[in-house]
Curated annotation (Swiss-Prot):
Protein family per UniProt: Belongs to the shikimate kinase family.
Pathway noted in the entry: Metabolic intermediate biosynthesis; chorismate biosynthesis; chorismate from D-erythrose 4-phosphate and phosphoenolpyruvate: step 5/7
Role, per record: Catalyzes the specific phosphorylation of the 3-hydroxyl group of shikimic acid using ATP as a cosubstrate.
Cofactors: Mg(2+)
GO CC annotation: cytosol
Quaternary structure (record): Monomer.
Descriptive protein name: Shikimate kinase
Organism for this UniProt entry: Nitrosospira multiformis (strain ATCC 25196 / NCIMB 11849 / C 71)
Amino acid sequence: MISTDAVAPAVDVKGEAGDRAATGNIFLVGMMGAGKTTVGRLLSHFLEKTFYDSDREIQKRTGVSIPTIFEIEGEEGFRRRETEILSELMNARNIILATGGGAVLSGVNRAMLKHGGTVIYLRASIDDLWRRTRHDKNRPLLQTSDPRARLAELFVQRDPLYRETAHIVVESGKRSPRHLAQSLAQQLTISSRTG
């Protein structure tokens, strides 16, 4: 079981991160099933920013699904495409970007995200992630004989990278996406005013 003791359940946005968020880009990182796309869409509405999902952008440009890319090009090919999309989107302004769960595996991606805007890590427990992803066949990394164990392995590998990259860590498991997005929007707006 993964402990959540070190993660504050409340949203706490202060100083420079809040300023970047109010005037620039916001990048959501976290595991598959953490709510990046759902919360990102809602947050973009509340903050009047344009929403992008890096996986959807890759699918639009290639014309095929993520599992198909994994099948043809492998994870390495997919990660290369992911870095290209992130690099392009770094030139955009006033956006909210939901990244793929593995975007932080690349040091180049972590640096781009960290310096390109405010990075928010949506963190959820393994149980919550499993509940949200267990029936989803569009998760190539979970197409194994023991997908829950694979999810736990990925979490252990990626959690430190998300933390390293993030300016803000938010527990996403127990709150509704709408409530979480509203809370984030309010805190980011307040922080940008009080600096």
